[in-house]
Amino acid sequence: MPTTMIPLEHYRSDNTTAAYSLRWSWAGWPSTGAFPSLDSNSWGTLHSLWEKDGIRVLERRCTDSQWQLTVSSRTNVVPSFIVARLKGRIDHAFRNSKSGFQFSRKVSLRSLGSNTEVEVQNYIANQVQKAGFCDPKFASQLSSFTRKWEPSDCSEAIVVTSGRYWFQLHLVLVIDHRHSIRDLQFLGRLFEEVQSIALDRRYRLSAVSVMPDHLHIRLRGVVEESPEAIALAFMNEICRGMKINPIWRPSYYVGTVGAYNMNAVRE
């Protein structure tokens, strides 16, 4: 593998594509009393404004004591921005109606996925076994670069002044041209570099699996960074930290993960 110092930002939003599934459950409560109602025109306006923010409302459940919105977002949308925009635009709609309503500061944003965190954790942990390598010795050595952190604290809430966040991601990076790297020493260095980056950037790892042609990471992010920023950070900093030429396909997969899946939200 050629060694050189790559530019600080070889992978950027303008030259890297993403496949993604980012879904969230937002909940807000009134400071006192009950929520006022909004008519269909007001909701339509809110939905249109949120779309411009990169947020799409998938479902909503509103009672007098709690409003819950299930939303999706684009990769460049920061979790704290989702909370600010959902709450802020509803606040503005209520101010226009002169209802006198005030939100509680107690809000929450919870990441959701098609699969639960346990299912994703097990999927990552079984990568080597699932691959069915012909060489059992290679498979055994490669399995050293798959790790689960148990018990994982990724599912713990991030508590900030604006509320509570549950922010878990599953990130997949693929070696360019799907080239298979069989150098175990190199793969071991990559495994260590992932952990170093997570520590430096205050991410919490739950599972990592380094495979010859791709990489899986399950982590808890920080609410000030978007899924896109986290993915690009790993893509760039792995290469920079290992002092190698860019090795990744200029694309990635990122999906939200949580204790609950979408079916649980709909029940």
Label for each model-derived stretch:
Residues 2-267:
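Charge-rich, low-complexity N-terminal segments
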